[in-house]
Amino acid sequence: MQEWFQNLFAATLGLGDLGITVGLVVSVIVKIVIILIPLILTVAYLTYFERKVIGFMQLRVGPNVTGPWGLIQPFADVFKLLFKEVTRPRLSNKALFYIGPIMSLAPSFAAWAVIPFNEEWVLTNINIGLLYILMITSLSVYGVIIAGWASNSKYSFLGAMRASAQSISYEIAMSAALVCVVMVSGSMNFSDIVAAQAKGIAGGSVFSWNWLPLFPIFIVYLISAVAETNRAPFDVAEGESEIVAGHHVEYSGFAFALFFLAEYIFMILISALTSLMFLGGWLSPFPQSWGFIGTPSAFWMFVKMAAVLYWYLWIRATFPRYRYDQIMRLGWKVLIPIGFAYIVILGLWMISPLNLWK
């Protein structure tokens, strides 16, 4: 795509060297639009499927009035939020009150710059893609803290403190799990990590993906990912029965929609990261000798992301909410020690004759 736009502006339109630069900028903008529009639509219909799945598990119907089978319900929700008044507490900090939602949303969008959907579908293919993801997603906690403090509400501030402590705690466990993947892959480039999962003793099959040899750390990662996104059963930061929606409590209308959008985009991002790091990314679960269904493609990437997202919804509909002290105990006394211990075990495993990743 980049070469096509550069040729269009440089040769066809006769802009020379300037055309190469213009073509590069235009191609980047087009790629951003191609990523963001489907992403926002996915968020809209993820809310629909979430309500349908939870309704099914609770023997309810779910949305079924707005449009056929309730398919227009996400757009009705969007219009409702857009036209609701954005109220602000009289004693709140006006500037920070509006900066908070933006700071929560911006990192969720920016992280998609390095997520590949196959070997070619990526906005920026950099060698420190994983490090970039960890760095950029950790910034979203500042938006939560700012929103909680700027609202000048005890419930908002308590929810912000809970969310920030939980996010920072589980980032450690999740990072330890991802370090194990980097150790066996030898790279922080997502394309290289996916390619490494097609090699080894069981190369070319579903058993060569990182979820199986790293299964204990895969479980640590999945639990940490749910806690990192503040989803049930780790949603004490916005526990309706305890602190009345946490740092969201003073937000309404479009400002609340930004927090809502950030949460679901982050959830989709985690599902993409799970697919790339543990589930083989765009690699097919079938042998390549099976023809089309055995060919690596973006289709398999989307299927794996959908499976992880369904797991998120199943978890929310199944498990009760943990207490805050239980969440902290699970993170610091269970998951983090397991993560660091497995790094040592994996290092010894890789230098032993039983190395599976040669």
Curated annotation (Swiss-Prot):
It is found in: Cell inner membrane. It is a multi-pass membrane protein. GO terms for molecular function: NADH dehydrogenase activity; oxidoreductase activity, acting on NAD(P)H, quinone or similar compound as acceptor; quinone binding. It catalyses: a quinone + NADH + 5 H(+)(in) = a quinol + NAD(+) + 4 H(+)(out). The chain crosses the membrane at residues 20-40, 95-115, 128-148, 168-188, 206-226, 253-273, 290-310, 334-354. Its main location: membrane. PROSITE patterns: COMPLEX1_ND1_2. Its EC number is 7.1.1.-. Keywords: Cell inner membrane, Cell membrane, Membrane, NAD, Quinone, Translocase, Transmembrane, Transmembrane helix, Ubiquinone. It holds the Pfam family NADHdh. GO terms for cellular component: plasma membrane. HAMAP family: NDH1_NuoH. Belongs to the complex I subunit 1 family. NDH-1 shuttles electrons from NADH, via FMN and iron-sulfur (Fe-S) centers, to quinones in the respiratory chain. The immediate electron acceptor for the enzyme in this species is believed to be ubiquinone. Couples the redox reaction to proton translocation (for every two electrons transferred, four hydrogen ions are translocated across the cytoplasmic membrane), and thus conserves the redox energy in a proton gradient. This subunit may bind ubiquinone. NCBIfam families: PRK06076.1-2 (NF004741). This is NADH-quinone oxidoreductase subunit H.
